[in-house]
């Protein structure tokens, strides 16, 4: 699906064909999206998590954003860290904060939080822990719930 009503160039893809398309947009001579500039995750609400990838072709000087939506209950997207090496830490950060599992990733583990941290802090339904190993987890500011 392509949103042509926007100045931004983005395409929505289903997760099941993402890896094949990723390899194609990276190697197709007319595209050559050889630079993954950013990857991020967003909790869209209503049981939808979204992973976004921003690409640039240095040869053709064009840009593209790929968006992939999954449900919270089946938050799995094929990893592209073997296509663009930089995706390694991008995908790990999104996994750590939102719990999207990047299948096929060679080292998918938490990168910002301790391995035994409970939950996914950037999900809208996240319930913060009262304590962590007996230490009180403070709120950033009183009244923020």
PLM features per residue range, with description:
Residues 1-145:
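Terminal low-complexity/charged segments
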């Amino acid at each position: 699906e392509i949103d042509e009503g926007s100045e931004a160039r983005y395409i929505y893809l289903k997760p099941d064909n993402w890896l094949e398309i990723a390899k194609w947009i990276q190697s197709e001579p007319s595209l050559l999206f050889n630079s993954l500039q950013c990857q991020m995750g967003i909790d869209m609400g209503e049981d939808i998590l979204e992973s976004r990838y921003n690409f640039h072709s240095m040869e053709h000087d064009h840009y593209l954003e790929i968006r992939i939506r999954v449900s919270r209950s089946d938050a799995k997207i094929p990893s592209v860290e073997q296509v663009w090496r930089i995706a390694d830490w991008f995908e790990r950060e999104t996994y750590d904060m939102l719990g999207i599992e990047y299948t096929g990733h060679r080292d998918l583990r938490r990168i910002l939080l301790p391995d035994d941290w409970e939950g996914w802090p950037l999900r809208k339904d996240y319930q913060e822990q009262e304590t962590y190993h007996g230490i009180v987890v403070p709120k950033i500011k009183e009244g923020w719930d």
